[in-house]
């Protein structure tokens, strides 16, 4: 294996959504440095942070139709039964909700929690309160995705936060998705809520760190030890 290939394989890819921001931060660094030298280094630090923010690493996803994986990197901020948002059209019965809060240092690529077909995508305008607050699921700008899976409908809601002002969803209605597949992102701090059937067996707890496409949030079977995996 060549040295160049080793270096290439060791570098985490950057998502193309970040290119304009990275260029803008670097140009701003040059301009600030022209005004006052120390400002260049300040701008350069922000540029490096921007590169880090838009990283898009590959993930090894467990391929088990009975499991629900995390759609986001971050901290589990809520676990419990809740009535899903009306716009998801998932009924008025309580479903199990797991919320994942992403801070500005989290990887913000969002991944499908299950394999299935996207039944609906619903965008709802709203406010930009702290995404870590429970009321954010009701009042903040958000984008809801409903996936028809082996175990019924699973809802995923991308929620904007104080800093995040841009929700991106690349998938479309009627698209087929695989668990762990990239479907969108939210820029600069946010939250994802996952709504699952109430009978699911939870595998996470509040305060736990989750990895998108890898951490199992819950399962519909009792066996959590064996499965196949896929690189995403």
Curated annotation (Swiss-Prot):
Cofactor field: pyruvate
Major subcellular site: membrane
Cofactor: how and how many bound: Binds 1 pyruvoyl group covalently per subunit.
Pfam families (alphabetical): PS_Dcarbxylase
Active site (record annotation): 190 (schiff-base intermediate with substrate)
Compartment(s) where it occurs, according to its Swiss-Prot or TrEMBL record: Cell membrane
Associated pathway: Phospholipid metabolism; phosphatidylethanolamine biosynthesis; phosphatidylethanolamine from CDP-diacylglycerol: step 2/2
Positions of post-translational Pyruvic acid (Ser) modification: 190
Keyword tags: Cell membrane, Decarboxylase, Lipid biosynthesis, Lipid metabolism, Lyase, Membrane, Phospholipid biosynthesis, Phospholipid metabolism, Pyruvate, Zymogen
MF terms (GO), sorted A to Z: phosphatidylserine decarboxylase activity
Reactions catalysed according to its record: a 1,2-diacyl-sn-glycero-3-phospho-L-serine + H(+) = a 1,2-diacyl-sn-glycero-3-phosphoethanolamine + CO2
Membrane topology according to the record: Peripheral membrane protein
Post-translational modification: Is synthesized initially as an inactive proenzyme. Formation of the active enzyme involves a self-maturation process in which the active site pyruvoyl group is generated from an internal serine residue via an autocatalytic post-translational modification. Two non-identical subunits are generated from the proenzyme in this reaction, and the pyruvate is formed at the N-terminus of the alpha chain, which is derived from the carboxyl end of the proenzyme.
Cellular component, GO annotation: plasma membrane
Domain of life: Bacteria
Site (Cleavage (non-hydrolytic)) residue list: 189-190
Gene Ontology biological process terms in this record: phosphatidylethanolamine biosynthetic process
Family: Belongs to the phosphatidylserine decarboxylase family. PSD-A subfamily.
Function: Catalyzes the formation of phosphatidylethanolamine (PtdEtn) from phosphatidylserine (PtdSer).
Record-linked NCBIfam families: PRK05305.1-1, PRK05305.1-2, PRK05305.1-3, PRK05305.2-5
Protein name (Swiss-Prot/TrEMBL): Phosphatidylserine decarboxylase proenzyme
Gene this protein is translated from: psd
């Amino acid at each position: 294996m060549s040295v160049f290939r080793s270096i290439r394989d060791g570098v985490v890819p950057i998502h193309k959504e970040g290119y304009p921001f990275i260029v803008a931060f670097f140009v701003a660094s040059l301009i600030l440095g022209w005004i006052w030298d120390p400002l260049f280094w300040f701008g350069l630090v922000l540029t490096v942070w921007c590169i880090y923010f838009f990283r898009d690493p590959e993930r090894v996803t467990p391929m088990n139709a009975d499991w629900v994986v995390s759609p986001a990197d971050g901290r589990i901020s809520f676990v419990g039964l809740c009535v899903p948002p009306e716009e998801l059209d998932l009924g008025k019965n309580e479903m199990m909700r797991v919320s994942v809060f992403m801070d500005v240092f989290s990887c913000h690529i969002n991944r499908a929690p299950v394999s299935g077909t996207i039944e609906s995508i619903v965008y709802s305008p709203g406010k930009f309160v702290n995404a870590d607050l429970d009321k954010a699921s009701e009042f903040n700008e958000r984008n809801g995705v409903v996936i028809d899976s082996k175990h019924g409908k699973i809802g995923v809601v991308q929620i904007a936060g104080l800093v995040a002002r841009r929700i991106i969803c690349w998938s479309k209605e009627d698209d087929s998705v695989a668990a762990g597949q990239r479907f969108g992102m939210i820029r600069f701090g946010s939250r994802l809520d996952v709504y699952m059937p109430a009978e699911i067996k939870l595998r996470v707890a509040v305060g736990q760190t989750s990895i998108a496409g890898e951490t199992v949030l819950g399962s519909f079977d009792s066996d959590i030890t064996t499965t196949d995996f896929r690189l995403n």
